[in-house]
């Protein structure tokens, strides 16, 4: 098993920056970048067509799907390849055919990647504080749609418990949880993730877990999501969650994502928890910390000065964090690659 120092060395950006913003985009591993470049050069030299190209690309899709399934504790047949968490939310909410008589319960601190697709549906949206979701459920509630980890507060909800207590279908935004905390999605209906955040993959990569693919209508068909199609547009959807694949993903992105998924090791969840706890404790000495103890990888605090200027100043010091616009908050992302030195640079920069 590689040491922490060996894993940290896999990320070139950490040679210069205290990179504490995986909640937006994770650091790209060297092996992922090298794989992307190598695959791009193959495409340049050999073209992007013909049987060898498509066989290679489809094989890479299968490989990535299997790795994501293992990470999310499901079968590969339950994983669709998407471009983002938002993609996954749109696929599910469009396929559920919600009407004005249907209610969807969600929290009041959701990302637009979930709340946007919700408002594009015809359902009535009921919002509640993240700790009062169950109280908002009524006889009209058809779906519960929540984040596993809030992108704002950094607090963690328990979608498995909510599912067990209500018996309702549940759509989970897993953008801030996949790769951060252990995930058992087997008891859940729909789980959408982004792969460029904590999984450290290339841009425009994501996944959607669909527990029972045959129960969700294909509302957004894509070219490679059918087993056959006719000139008139009729088609036969692929078996399993592949029927919900968003579309074509280039071989460079697939190669990079496959390598990125191999970088993390078994101790990553413990390391994230340890670094987040240390970060929270250090910030709590001087600031109001919004994130409760023992959550996930995000730590959100309220600065005592202008957050925009403070984030800019920190960047000048080589510390990368995220301002949460219109909320007067700053968010710190602690990954399995985060070191004590990174946190010391953050604290020093805030002085």
PLM segments and residue spans:
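Pyridoxal 5′-phosphate
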Residues: 1-351
């Amino acid at each position: 098993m590689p040491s922490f120092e060996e894993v940290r060395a896999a990320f070139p950006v950490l040679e210069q920056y205290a990179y504490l913003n995986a909640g937006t985009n994770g650091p790209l591993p060297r092996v992922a970048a090298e794989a992307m470049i190598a695959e791009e050069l193959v495409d340049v030299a050999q073209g992007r067509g013909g049987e060898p190209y498509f066989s290679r690309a489809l094989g890479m899709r299968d490989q990535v799907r299997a790795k994501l399934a293992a990470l999310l504790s499901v079968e590969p047949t339950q994983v669709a390849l998407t471009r983002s968490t938002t993609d996954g939310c749109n696929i599910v909410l469009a396929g559920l055919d919600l009407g004005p008589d249907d209610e969807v319960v969600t929290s009041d601190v959701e990302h637009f990647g979930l709340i946007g697709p919700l408002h594009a549906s015809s359902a009535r949206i009921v919002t509640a504080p993240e700790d009062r979701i169950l109280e908002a459920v009524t006889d009209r509630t058809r779906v519960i749609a929540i984040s596993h980890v809030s992108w704002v507060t950094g607090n963690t909800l328990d979608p498995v418990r909510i599912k067990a207590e209500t018996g309702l279908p549940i759509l989970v935004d897993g953008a801030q949880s996949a790769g951060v905390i252990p995930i058992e999605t087997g008891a859940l209906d729909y789980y959408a993730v982004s792969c460029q955040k904590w999984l450290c993959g290339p841009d425009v990569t994501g996944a959607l877990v669909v527990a029972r693919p045959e129960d969700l209508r294909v509302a957004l068909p894509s070219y490679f999501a059918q087993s056959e199609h006719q000139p008139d547009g009729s088609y036969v959807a692929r078996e399993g969650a592949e029927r919900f694949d968003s579309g074509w993903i280039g071989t460079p992105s697939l190669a990079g994502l496959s390598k990125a998924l191999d970088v993390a090791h078994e101790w990553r969840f413990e390391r994230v928890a340890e670094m987040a706890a240390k970060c929270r404790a250090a910030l709590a000495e001087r600031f109001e910390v919004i994130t409760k103890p023992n959550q996930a990888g995000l730590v959100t605090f309220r600065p005592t000065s202008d957050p925009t200027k403070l984030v800019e100043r920190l960047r000048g010091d080589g510390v990368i964090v995220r301002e949460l616009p219109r909320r007067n908050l700053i968010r710190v992302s602690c990954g399995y690659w985060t070191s004590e030195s990174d946190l010391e640079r953050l604290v020093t920069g805030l002085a």
